[in-house]
Amino acid sequence: VFPDRTPHPSLLEAKRAQQPFTLTAEICDWSISLTVTSEHLFRATDNERLNWRLGSLSDAHLEGSQVLQLPPEGSQTIVIDADSNLLAGGDQEILLDVWITTEQATHALSAGHEIARSQHVLALADTTRERETRPAEISHQGEQLLVAADEVSWHMDAATGFITDWVIDGRALLDAPVADCFVRAPLDNDICSSEVDNPSPEAWLAKWQVAGLFDLEHRCTGVEVKGATVTSQHEYLNDAGVAIRSVWSHTFDAEGGVDIAIEVSVDPEMPPLPRVGMRLLLSDKPEAVSWLGRGPHENYHDRKLSADLGAWSCDRQAMQTPYIFPSDNGLRCNVRQAVIGSVCIERIDDDFAFAVSDFGVESLMRAQHTFECMEQSALHVHVDGYHMGVGGDDSWTPSVRPEYLLNAETYRWGCRLSVAHDDRT
């Protein structure tokens, strides 16, 4: 727990991993078989209620509950009848959420306390449907490329190849260009057993510093306009030469949105990257953030057992985790859509991860204590196609499991940026 006794995200992970019930579900002839198994060795259930909800990320279609009566290490299967069209999926995932709560208060637990929870994805959403849009018109104004669509306008700098301005109803949304981001504020596990005067050469931080990852020099090598698509090519250089290349394809539509497809190529001599994503600096700081994805609390790709898929919303401050030693925090994974004030971010093909911060990477890296974190005037939003795992299975060592390392030579990802409307979620 934190000093104020609020739960640490890892405590929620531990609770889910060590809960005393196992819950499994499968579809059988358009019905759902839900099996609950008790891991209590000597105790029968006498104060537990089984609850379930069947629906999409944002809507419940069927709900139910019943008293749970199991002997020690016993199992019980219930059958949930569901509409065949619902289980066939469609535009949205179909999920079964199951949780077990206390019936009556005990000396240790209040009535309704959640003892166990599990989520089961029964049908995947169809993501192959193409969006029907009209292409936008792109004009040239010196070194600037201008896209105007209804009340929305975009500006791209032909010299840097990045979007520099995004204006809605005369209000500028960006405080800096939308650009690649490959770094994160180092975690304890990234620093591992390093000492102030004796850094460990095996630490991820040391390897990133040797590779010059935090000091890469950006160079735009070309910008091409073809119809409603602007393609820009970028190089990031360290002392040894070109470390990373990226190609951004921006396709603007007449509704004021842009689909961004990004391909990143990494020199094979580079260490695994912390992230492959983009950074947006937003001028406005909304009070709340909402998203469709894993939540409600912070989760990383190797730390998301307790983070369920759903439609979540919370205060901007709650999107950030105040670790005693300032570091990267607040990531949410497997996101389909995020709404941050006037900005809507949507997946195109694959899910993304995102984080919202009042501080930013540089401020977090400079600070040694939370009170030293300097809040920035702009809101830092990271949208990641890929993000390295946290690791730390054996305490503070560079022990990220191989499947959560970003050591490929090529990455492809993308997202859509558009104006957020009340009916988005």
Set out the residue ranges of the language-model regions:
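Substrate-binding clefts and catalytic carboxylate motifs of secreted carbohydrate-active enzymes
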Residues: 1-73, 86, 352-380, 390
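Conserved, mostly hydrophobic/aromatic
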Residues: 14, 36, 98, 151, ...
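Extracellular and select intracellular beta-sandwich modules with Ser/Thr-enriched
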Residues: 62-64, 113-118
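Solvent-exposed, conformationally flexible loop/turn segments
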Residues: 71-77, 408
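Beta-strand/loop-rich accessory regions of lumenal/periplasmic or secreted enzymes
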Residues: 83-91, 120-425
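Short, aromatic- and glycine-rich surface loops/edge beta-strands on solvent-exposed regions
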Residues: 90-102
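Beta-sandwich strand segments
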Residues: 106-115, 394
